[in-house]
Amino acid sequence: MPDATGVIARNPFEEAPSRLNQYTPEEAAALQARLEKKLGPEYISSRPGAAGLKVHYLAADKCINLANEVFGFNGWSSSIQNIQIDFVDESPNTGKVSLGLSVIVRVTLKDGAYHEDLGYGHIENCKGKAAAFEKAKKEATTDALKRALRNFGNVLGNCIYDKDYISKVSKLKTVPSKLDVGDLHRHPDFAPIKKEPMRVKPSLEDDDLPPNPSIAGRNTSTNSAADMDAEFGSDVFDEADFNVGEGEYPDGIVAEDTQKRHQPPTPVGRPNAHLNLPKHALGAQASGNQHVVTPSKPERPMNLAPAGRQIPNQALNNRPFPPPAQNQYTNQRQSVPLPGSNGGLQNGRSIPLGQRASNGMATGSDAGAQVPIKQEHGAKQPNPAPQNTAVPATPGINGQGPPVVGFLSARGADMLRENPHSAATVAPAFNPHAESPSIRKTAGVDHTKSIPISKPMLAGSASPLSNQTRDFINPSAEMHRKIGAPSGSVVGGPMNRGPSVSSYRPLTRPNVDPKAAAQNNTAAANRMAPNMNGKRPPLNDVTNETLPGGNGCTPAPGLNDPKRAKYDESMSAQQHQQQHQH
């Protein structure tokens, strides 16, 4: 009915028309294929049940995540249709509550299809009614939701009721998942700060370098044909070189032999000539040309290096090159060509294309703009046919001769590093036969030769004594150990330390004259015994008692004392005292 403003308001008691989004046949088929798959062992949980058996189930959180994954977060919904309380009992003595209830939940998809099922929850002997109803209703709702979702297919839990499947999948082992901190939703105040990668600042010597061929190759798609020719020079990347049509991919086509094709003439006004590049060189340039030699990047010892092309002055960031006498390349790295080294091969190896002088090479100022490539020193080669241009020999770094290459000692290497040119004649050479005094060597073995070691060679040398035990002995456990003295049983002590090999000398017997030995034996036999019994006299006891008539402690005379008066037992005690007085 219209209101005061004349606008007809909708009846709030009427149900709103449902907006259904029907699945297309393709979506329905894809959804059906997902629902028919069975779950992996990582989704299935188990708990102990009756009679010692395990009860397998699908946790509620995993079930909801599976529904969102299959249907989408906005592709399904759930609603509680009915809650029925079955019983509520309260104990009159303890006041504890026991109840049970059932809940019916409906799960509806976005196209209107739905399933509903029953869930049950209960609690026994709860202290309060509120806690009892909360626990029972949540349990029943969760149970009803899982049972309603399993009606859609195996992937939502229906496969758990297959005993044959459970018996097989429960034997599979799962690897615990690792927590990825980057996937966590963090609060902005506690989120880790992402550090930007450090940008390498280009050095001053790289300001006038030619552009990277890989970067320049990517920019050619947006440039015109004239700009491409001006930047790369001539028709280096022409279709004739690749032998590829307009609709073909050049990386999958094998280029024909470059020696059988005739090189196109050099157009007038273009600074560079056409270079015949081999197949591997073309592939290297297409993939980034990582072997380009620049003043800041030394060359690599490869048999075939990329071609050193000449780059026009107008293409180098619109900055002309300085004259050849002030060229930066000649100040940092100059090639050292040898006489007659313009051939195609050197000692059976191919020379990089940048070292050859072709018929179409430019001369004069263009030669100074070319990126030179260092050439190896090899044997003399036959002089090839005369070329149109000749590359003059250039000195080494800073106008000096090339550094001397050889084997030097460690001290010589340090001297050569500080002054590579003047120290080459003064630095000591490496001596492979030098003997170091700090290295111990086995006695009796010739270390200057490589020969097998036999047992007679080692007969004169003794191996160091090995330790008697490796177990640690507590020094306090020795009862007769002197305070401050090292223990005799400690591993590595001076008592157990074996003699070194270098200082060991075998024991030798002294040369004894047999006549002198016989005289010594005769003199020892005629020597008188120390006492009448021919034995060592026994030790006497010492006392500190004061004898009568004496001033101090006088030790009692021993039995074998020569100053003691000898008497017979039959003598009277009177005579014995008189002898002592005398």
From Swiss-Prot:
<feature type="region of interest" description="Disordered">
    <location>
        <begin position="485"/>
        <end position="582"/>
    </location>
</feature>
<keyword id="KW-0234">DNA repair</keyword>
<comment type="function">
    <text>Involved in DNA double-strand break (DSB) repair and recombination. Promotes the annealing of complementary single-stranded DNA and by stimulation of the RAD51 recombinase.</text>
</comment>
<keyword id="KW-0227">DNA damage</keyword>
<feature type="compositionally biased region" description="Low complexity">
    <location>
        <begin position="516"/>
        <end position="529"/>
    </location>
</feature>
<feature type="compositionally biased region" description="Polar residues">
    <location>
        <begin position="326"/>
        <end position="335"/>
    </location>
</feature>
<dbReference type="GO" id="GO:0005634">
    <property type="term" value="C:nucleus"/>
</dbReference>
<dbReference type="Pfam" id="PF04098">
    <property type="entry name" value="Rad52_Rad22"/>
</dbReference>
<dbReference type="GO" id="GO:0006312">
    <property type="term" value="P:mitotic recombination"/>
</dbReference>
<dbReference type="InterPro" id="IPR007232">
    <property type="entry name" value="Rad52_Rad59_Rad22"/>
</dbReference>
<dbReference type="GO" id="GO:0000724">
    <property type="term" value="P:double-strand break repair via homologous recombination"/>
</dbReference>
<feature type="compositionally biased region" description="Basic and acidic residues">
    <location>
        <begin position="194"/>
        <end position="204"/>
    </location>
</feature>
<keyword id="KW-0233">DNA recombination</keyword>
<keyword id="KW-0539">Nucleus</keyword>
<feature type="DNA-binding region">
    <location>
        <begin position="146"/>
        <end position="150"/>
    </location>
</feature>
<protein>
    <recommendedName>
        <fullName>DNA repair and recombination protein radC</fullName>
    </recommendedName>
</protein>
<dbReference type="GO" id="GO:0045002">
    <property type="term" value="P:double-strand break repair via single-strand annealing"/>
</dbReference>
<dbReference type="InterPro" id="IPR004585">
    <property type="entry name" value="DNA_recomb/repair_Rad52"/>
</dbReference>
<keyword id="KW-0238">DNA-binding</keyword>
<dbReference type="GO" id="GO:0003677">
    <property type="term" value="F:DNA binding"/>
</dbReference>
<comment type="subunit">
    <text>Part of a complex that includes RAD51, RAD52 and RAD59.</text>
</comment>
<comment type="similarity">
    <text>Belongs to the RAD52 family.</text>
</comment>
<dbReference type="GO" id="GO:0000730">
    <property type="term" value="P:DNA recombinase assembly"/>
</dbReference>
<feature type="region of interest" description="Disordered">
    <location>
        <begin position="194"/>
        <end position="226"/>
    </location>
</feature>
<feature type="region of interest" description="Disordered">
    <location>
        <begin position="310"/>
        <end position="400"/>
    </location>
</feature>
<dbReference type="InterPro" id="IPR041247">
    <property type="entry name" value="Rad52_fam"/>
</dbReference>
<dbReference type="InterPro" id="IPR042525">
    <property type="entry name" value="Rad52_Rad59_Rad22_sf"/>
</dbReference>
